[in-house]
A protein has these predicted regions:
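Charge-dense, helix-prone N-terminal extensions
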Residues: 1-109
């Protein structure tokens, strides 16, 4: 697993400090899920969000952005398929979201 950032290098621990406490457990679970999808995962910690890519080709498949009480998620399965955008407030549809993220990881080239 590689960690990459453009511009000022930002670590997840620094980023975690800006995530509202109410959102942290859900964000952490989604982050861990993405990191465990494969050895070729690249985590790009940006100013307000984290983007997960498949290998150094930077084919991103998931974008997680915390808000005050939710997580904005963008999922990309292919450059030819429109991006799916979701807002998650609780664990209610977590398994469904994980399935979509895994499908995106599997299908992105």
């Amino acid at each position: 697993m590689d960690f990459v950032s453009f511009g000022n290098k930002k670590e997840f621990n620094d980023f975690k400090n800006q995530i509202p406490i109410i959102v942290q457990p859900l964000f952490e679970e989604l982050r861990q899920f993405c990191l465990e999808l494969g050895e070729n995962i690249v985590e790009d910690v940006r100013m307000h969000r984290i983007v997960f890519c498949k290998s150094m080709t930077f084919r991103w498949f998931t974008d997680l952005e915390p808000t005050q009480n939710s997580i904005l998620i963008k999922i990309q399965k292919s450059r030819k398929i429109p991006i799916t955008s979701l807002e998650v407030f609780s664990y209610d549809k977590l398994e469904e979201i994980k399935t979509s993220i895994k499908d995106a990881y599997t299908s992105i080239h």
